[in-house]
Amino acid sequence: MNDKYAQQRLLKEQLPHTWDALFARFGRFTEIQVQAIPPLLDGHNCVLVSATASGKTEAAFAPLLEALKENSKPFRQLAILYIVPTRALARDLVRRLQQPLEKLALRVQVKTGDEAALNAARPPALLITTPESFDSLLANHPRMLKDIRAVVIDELHIFDNTPRGDQLRILLNRLRRLKRYALSRGDITNDAMQYCALSATIHDPAAVAARYFNDPRVIQVSGQRALDAELLELESVVTLDSLFAELKTRDVKKVLAFCQSRAECEQWAFEMRDGTPFGDRVFVHHASLDAKVRRHAETQFAQSEVALCFATSTLELGIDIGDVDLIVLIGAPGNLSAFLQRIGRGNRRTARTAVVCCYRNETERALFQIFVAAAQAGAITASQPYFFRPSIVVQQLCSYVKQTTYGELDPDSAFELFADLHGTPLLAKAHYDQIIEHLTAKNYFTTTDSRLLKPGAAWSELFEQRAIYTNLVDLTRVTIDVIDEETGRKLGEVERAIKPGGTFLFGGHARQATRLTWRKLIVRSAAPAREARPPQLRSAWRPMAPALAQAVAETLGAPQPQHPADLVIVTEAEAEDESPVTWVFHCAGDAYGLILGEVLETLYHVRVEDYNDLYLAVKGLVPTGPLEFTAVQVQSGLRRRWKQMESWFELGRFQEQLPLDVRRASVSAAFDVAGFVQTFQQRRIAEAVTAE
């Protein structure tokens, strides 16, 4: 006890400026703060991994702010860049930090698409922003960033191995290049920066952080809150009615329910608005709603003592929505990380997390069983192998040319930005040259006499659409604004027009379309109608990862191999004049299953009639014995199927602006040919063993 007291006192003494502002109201440091603050004070780059609401934000800020306050002169430049994945999280952080930083006489501001423009002549000491707004700042106000001393990346696992994560890697390279240039001109005296990344759930944090900055020290504190999980079969609306009706006996007042799609959020909110303990305190939160509408829902939900909110992944992250008594999951998310993120939103001020997992089929039940077991064991599964997405090259070149002094760039110099921290290129030079040639042919760029690139007509169109700084939205997605007839306010966006007179669900309420003008749908509130349905809203679909598919197969009791190397088949005899049907239990996910089917068709002249994440249904006889194929045969299957699979992976909004060869190569990289070969090479096809 005395040792811990002495440790706390010593740490407090090391923070003479920031203790009172950031920690005094808590009275003590949390474990992650005890472990993280000393190395950060010493100037080390760190990645902090600990549970939600454990104090990671203060652990990162205190040492960085302390370094600023050590200088007695007022600091008038932007010093700390804090990068978050969502605008809502940025707003939440600035609300939390405004008062503490006022005590330190330091200004904090938010820079996102929702906020007013920054005054470049009077920047804050701390800027909270998203990758997209960071990109815009680099392109339009690069000099404002030359004095940055530290970069913090919040929710690192949300970014990594996604288009936005790849974008962030290149943005940091651009920032480092900018600072080297400023140093060479004598504008700054030191181009060094300190880095800190934060995450609650991440596998191999050192390797992940090393993609963004050098020499990361891992500061990891184990210990998730205890999990009380209940699995409930969701048969109908009555199931949730019964669940919510008994909440009073559980002393549950505030519930956050995660759905798998925006349409489900709308439908469930409409169904639950009457006859539940929540009355009219039923809210909806998803990406198709306008930012102001979402913000209103966040505020109302946080301030309500009794409330229910249906949300998609938009509320997965750690914005303050008050103390949630119960998390309800309607359908299983696609991976463990999303499951942990969602359940982490509940009971943040207690030692236990309560969650009800509602499954609609046996696969969802198996997924929940796997996720709950992993969460209770504190396990974090490995993510899919990392690959760099070439579509980011298109977006970053379009942004980088805006940053250059004369509005033109040297493609060879720009290529150096697309490299890891050791200078190894992230894509082949041949592919890069193809991209440059393709973008020039498509008039994104024109070429000067000295082989420099200048913006072309297609670039100008992107710029007018304010689309050159983001990888978030599909370029082909055309939306229609939903406008409230009475107030004139935008409620959100839909992707297909609703005919005047039609009734639909939006924002948890029934709306009637009154008229449709160009890209604007005018609506009024409508009386609840049982036939009202949500508008068609597209949702991304992702294939199940091979390791997760294997775990699902084992949980469901699918035929298992007698030996680890066996690939189990079940052959069903058909009528004499028909070929047999062979069920191939690959248990490796949809993507691997699809290409395995291509390989089997090539090897055995059979026909695949159906496939999913666990099995193939093959018309014809698949012989037992070694499964022998080549990587060339796998690539041949990918060449036939790449277009079908392109939308399965997160490849970035500029994927279709790549030359065909590079598009195919990026699908192949996402598919992970080496992983496929490792999974199936040397496997032996064997009939399932039947129980005696």
List the predicted regions and their residue ranges.
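Helicase motor core with emphasis on the C-terminal RecA-like subdomain
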Residues: 2-9, 34-35, 41-47, 51-131, ...
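Short linear motifs in intrinsically disordered
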Residues: 88, 209, 344, 463-475, ...
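Accessory beta->alpha helical hairpin/"wing" motif in late/C-terminal subdomains of nucleic-acid enzymes
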Residues: 446-467, 521-530, 615-617
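Short, compositionally biased strand/turn segments
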Residues: 299-301, 305, 472-497
